[in-house]
Amino acid sequence: MKIVALTLVAFVALAGASCPYAAPAQAYSAPAAPSGYPAPPCPTNYLFSCQPNLAPAPCAQEAQAPAYGSAGAYTEQVPRYVGSPNREQVQQFHQRIGMAALMEELRGLGQGIQGQQY
């Protein structure tokens, strides 16, 4: 065990010695003027969902001063498809899970009885 530990320490020391020293990075300074890319043209955006229809989503308005580049062009809220369930929905879910487990258990018992010979 001591040999393994000694070998590991020697390997780590060798690996550390072979790596060049990296000087600490300089502090980041923000650019003087904001720069950005122009927003791509947006004729029609579609929000996709599980429903068969597509609903067009409007493009965001141009960014006002101070301009933040193209990041200001995409300010639409993220759609929320599923809200938090109420108590009745949670109870129905638990009942369905319980019934599914019961049906699976009864299926297993039925197959076990059919496979037995009397």
From Swiss-Prot:
GO biological process, one term: vitelline membrane formation involved in chorion-containing eggshell formation
Keyword field: Secreted, Signal
Gene Ontology MF terms: structural constituent of vitelline membrane
Main localization category: secreted
Tagged with keyword Signal: yes
Signal peptide: 1-17
Domain VM: 36-75
Disulfide bond sites: none
A Gene Ontology cellular-component term: vitelline envelope
Subcellular location as annotated: Secreted
Function (record text): Major early eggshell protein.
Protein family (similarity comment): Belongs to the vitelline membrane family.
Protein name: Vitelline membrane protein Vm32E
Organism the protein comes from: Drosophila sechellia
